[in-house]
Amino acid sequence: AKQRDYDIIVLGATGFTGRRAARELINQYSSSYRIGLAARNKQRLEALADQLGLPAKDCFTVDTTDAERVREVVGLTRLIVSTAGPYALYGESVIAACAQLGTHYTDITGEVDFIARMSERYADKAQASGARLVSFCGFDSVPAEIAVHKLAQRFGPEDQLIIQSYYTTKGGLNGGTIATMLNKLASGGDNQHIGPDVLVAAGKYNEVAGKITAENESTTPELPTLVQPKGAQFFGFVGRIQRWSTPFIMSGVNARVVYRSMSHQQFLGSYAFKRFGYSEQSSLGRWYAPGSFIMTTLLLLTLTILGPFAWFRSLLSNFVPSPGEGPSEESIEQGFMQLNVFAESSSGQKEQLQCAFSGDPSNKATV
């Protein structure tokens, strides 16, 4: 982005995740970057700035429903870090302003259908202005993308590559994440935007390599065909990891993001796979301890069956954290994530790796 008054402005800074992101940025990088904070509530914003030792002049009150005010704030910085969700409700004005003004943008959304729509609407504008719009930069889907990329690099050209991930996690959900989940259940998603390759089709590679033109179309690498790995969406005991397992709750997000990244890398010539499959499961306990498996199965079935009903969402909202709330600091510090990933190609080559992070996966490890 062009020379601006700030390098980074954190939008949604007074939310649960926003506060943590702002604190980390200011503590670690304020000597190297000019950092500002933006949020809707002036009093809470000034209180946060005081806690972090940030001058009041570096704080900006902004309501994302006010498009003109959003443009003013976006125009002050080279990069917007948005933690203000649900993004389907509050995010479009920010993305639109960044795309138009050439301001780089990143967020921690897991709303695939929303980002697909945003890419369709604003990718061309972002390419023209020089803005880079980068989503899914939290727990969904940074660990998955890192692991898949590291494993895929070990393989040469293959007819097929299958990668399967197993998550062991300990952590809590904050109110913003739950609000996003409830909003997603309420909307039911947008059926035309939930295909496994939706982010590939929507992106058209604008943010990575520019549009495919008539001049280079004949030499463009063929993108991998998506296949369903054996054992995807499995409920039961998995011999490979000797654990009970269910589908991972964020697999619907991560699989689509991973396929987009895989396709982009293949477009750039990094990989050469004709078919590619990716799936995610939760790792929930040894054979003699099925309790967490049973509880997780019941939870997933309950959300699937009752989630579309307004009365259930209203009831559920009484028992979960509200936006701005989240796990205690002690709980966050005690959290962890371990990701075991297995890859197998059609030629018989097998590879695996393990990623591990200390701290709550959503509220420390990836913030």
What are the functions of these language-model segments?
Residues Y6-Y29:
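N-terminal Rossmann NAD(P)H-binding glycine-rich loop of SDR-like oxidoreductase domains
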Residues Q153-V367:
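C-terminal catalytic/substrate-binding lobe primarily of soluble NAD(P)-dependent oxidoreductases
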Residues A38-K42, D63-T64:
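N-terminal Rossmann-fold cofactor-binding loop
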Residues L48-P55:
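Short, conserved SAM-binding/catalytic segment
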Residues Y33-G36:
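Conserved beta-strand positions in the Rossmann-like core of class I SAM-dependent methyltransferases
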Residues D7, R78-L79, H104:
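Structural motif
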Residues P86-A209, E217:
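Glycine-/Pro-rich loop/turn segments that contact NAD(P) or position catalytic residues
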